[in-house]
């Protein structure tokens, strides 16, 4: 996790191994002395499951009760609640009611 602006992670989230969450490009690109790539907040709402090897970049907004599949890249996307997303670029796979861990 690399935070230069703001990263908000809700309650009961599950973030698997080898994930990257970064709200900055870690460098500035200036056009006519104006910063063209500012840092941007990341919001991950409650009960989101982020599977392994996923990258979430600046400007991402993941609504509650989402699943983000393994090896996905979330770039400035708004992911709607109660859905499974996967891929690079990220795509909606299906809608569902809820997810939970099995005992």
PLM regions: where:
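A short acidic/histidine/glycine-rich donor-binding loop in glycosyltransferase catalytic cores
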Residues: 83-84, 91
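Flexible, glycine/small-residue-enriched loop-and-beta-strand segment within the central core
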Residues: 1-60, 77, 88-89, 95-97
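Short-chain dehydrogenase/reductase
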Residues: 49, 67-68, 73, 84-86
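Acidic, glycine-enriched loop/beta-strand segments at the rims
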Residues: 63
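A glycine/serine/threonine-rich, flexible loop-to-helix segment
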Residues: 97-103
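Short arginine-rich
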Residues: 78-82
């Amino acid at each position: 996790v690399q935070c230069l602006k703001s990263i908000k992670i809700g309650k009961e989230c599950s973030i698997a191994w080898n994930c990257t969450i970064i709200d900055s490009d870690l460098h500035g690109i200036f056009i006519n002395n104006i910063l063209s790539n500012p840092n941007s907040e990341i919001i991950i709402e409650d009960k989101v499951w982020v599977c392994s090897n996923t990258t979430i970049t600046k400007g991402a907004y993941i609504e509650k009760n989402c699943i983000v599949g393994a090896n996905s890249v979330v770039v400035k996307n708004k992911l709607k609640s109660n859905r499974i997303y996967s891929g690079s670029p990220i795509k909606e796979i299906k809608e569902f009611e809820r997810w939970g861990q099995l005992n």
